[in-house]
Regions:
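Mid-to-C-terminal Rossmann-like scaffold of FAD/NAD(P)H-dependent oxidoreductases
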Residues: 2-3, 22, 277-381, 413-419, ...
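Short functional micro-motifs and their immediate structural scaffolds
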Residues: 429-431, 450
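A Rossmann-like FAD-binding core segment of flavoenzymes
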Residues: 26-28, 73-90, 97, 164-261
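Beta1-alpha1 glycine-rich phosphate/pyrophosphate-binding loop at the start
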Residues: 2-72, 153, 161-182, 423
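Short cysteine-rich clusters marking metal-coordination/redox-active sites
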Residues: 421-424, 442-445
Length: 457
């Protein structure tokens, strides 16, 4: 009987476990995760912090899921090393667990930059785990204001969550724009306007010079412009770094993340990696190897890895870099190379940006082929454009109706009546005969939802 071991109890790990169980009903499955909780929906943490949803809406699996599926779980346990020569995983308490096939699905952890005074942990927060979310909710009770510094979408999520919790929030951007990985300046300006409209103070090209601490408590920060800003909560967020430290002595090939091929296989023939920790080769001629934080990507890669661990021959053939989210009520979808930095790319963006409309759409071409796209505020054509990019279509071959709908402001709102899945944030098709209270399942990530009046509007 095969022994499958999965390190990481996030979406990539859980999807792999479910897939293995489907293909190998009798195989032994062991899951190890350092968070002491059953699987939960990480992208819903900001809404939980903001008090928009209760804790019970976070759970993706009940505690008895593991027992019911004959999975041995070690939750709250940390893996400190693996030994491919003896097929062993080593836990912090030195327990060794044997495997025939192993999945590394350890995601990433938020790197925090240090500033003078920031070694005092008291008021400094981050939002990655359910424990982080609970910690923030507790601190918000006695706080009036917060400062957040950073530019990518984890920082944006934290900023929005703190603001929605009722705090006065100042957001420091070290550069001139938000989320530079996917956004050009015009796209970023649309979102910045929305954040300002909500009452969030934005300071661009400003960093922290010093954290102002009194009686071991954070009282504020001093900016690089020598301004003192009061705050009791401080969010410092840098990029998510793949959690690969425990692989140092293992011989598993890593770069930024664990290097895998499109079967999610590492350089060992029985060790796989999937999700935020995995690094696929560059796709779409982008020169940029992809390892970005994306729920749906982790979900699909877990499925491919699980299938292969159970003896199949599955391949991950999606675009590695699709990102869908919602910030301040604005839908954002980025596909492929959405913000190229060198001059080999051509940008098509029709009538956008427009000073009065907070919608923005663009296509990125390389040698006439569409290699990337960005949608802000209206994501109506995102699914169609994903197919265009995946099929390596030339710009001249794209359906003219699709281009008109994307770029012609007169048809900008077209017929989109979609609803975005609260977990994977991709369009959720609502059946035409759906009624309030019916149950529907997101075809992309599998979450089950009750149909509400809002969805039917
Ligand atoms: C606040 C927030 C909002 C987000 N919003 C969106 C969104 O709107 N859209 C979107 O597409 N994505 C979003 N994401 C990103 C998305 O959640 C991730 O891409 C996804 O969770 C990655 O899944 P994973 O299984 O690869 O890793 P993870 O979900 O990070 O799970 C990995 C697990 O492995 C554990 N682990 C790590 N090291 C060890 C070890 N040595 N031993 C044992 N266990 C270990 C970790 O603690 C963790 O529990 C959001 C993330 C956050 C934090």
């Amino acid at each position: 009987m095969a022994e499958h071991v999965i390190i990481g109890n996030g979406v990539a790990g859980i999807k792999a476990a479910e897939t293995i169980r489907k293909h190998d009903p009798d195989g032994k499955i062991t899951m190890i995760g350092d968070e002491a909780y059953a699987f939960y929906y990480r992208p819903q943490l900001p809404e939980f912090v903001a008090g928009k949803i209760e804790e019970d809406r976070l759970w993706g699996k009940k505690k008895d899921f593991y027992e019911k599926n004959n999975i041995t779980s070690h939750l709250g346990k940390t893996v400190t090393g693996i030994k491919p020569d003896t097929n062993e995983v080593i836990l912090k308490d030195n327990t060794a667990i044997n495997y025939d096939s192993l999945l590394i699905a350890t995601g990433g952890s938020i790197k925090r930059r240090n500033y003078p005074g920031s070694d005092l942990n008291g008021g400094i927060v981050q939002l990655k785990t359910i424990d982080d979310a609970k910690n923030i909710k507790e601190k918000v009770k006695s706080a009036k204001s917060a400062v957040v510094v950073g530019e990518d979408f984890l920082t944006l999520s934290l900023t929005e969550a703190l603001h929605s919790s009722g705090l006065k929030v100042t957001y420091l951007l070290r550069g001139d724009r938000l989320w530079p990985e996917i956004m050009d300046k015009d796209a970023s300006d649309i979102l910045l306007l929305r954040l300002k409209g909500k009452g969030i103070t934005i300071k661009q090209e400003t960093d922290i010079k010093e954290v102002y601490v009194k009686n071991k408590l954070i009282h504020g920060i001093i900016t690089t412009d020598d301004e003192l800003i009061d705050c009791q909560i401080l969010g410092i967020v840098d990029k998510l770094q793949p959690s690969i430290g425990f692989l140092n002595e293992s011989g598993v090939n890593t770069d930024n993340g664990v290097l895998v091929n499109n079967k999610m296989l590492t350089n060992f023939d029985n060790i796989y990696a999937a999700g935020d920790v995995a690094q696929l080769p560059a796709d779409l001629d982008s020169d940029i190897p992809e390892i970005n934080v994306r729920w749906l990507k982790a979900w699909k890669q877990g499925q491919v890895a699980g299938s292969n661990m159970a003896g199949n021959d599955a391949e991950y053939d999606d675009i590695a870099s699709i990102s869908a989210t919602q910030i301040c009520g604005i839908d954002i979808v980025s596909i492929g190379v959405s913000n190229p930095l060198n001059g080999d790319y051509k940008i098509m963006r029709g009538d956008y940006p427009h000073p009065e409309i907070d919608v923005y759409k663009k296509l990125v071409l390389k040698n006439d082929r569409v290699v990337g796209a960005l949608f802000i505020g209206n994501v109506q054509e995102a699914r169609e454009v994903t197919k265009v990019i995946k099929n390596r279509t030339n710009y001249s071959e794209i359906d003219k109706k699709l281009l008109k709908q994307m770029f012609d402001l007169n048809s900008r709102f077209g017929t989109f009546h979609g609803f975005l899945c609260p977990v994977c944030k991709l369009e959720l098709p609502i059946p035409p005969d759906a009624k309030v209270g019916d149950k529907i399942t997101c075809p992309a990530c599998g979450i089950e939802l009750n149909v509400t009046e809002k969805m039917l509007k």
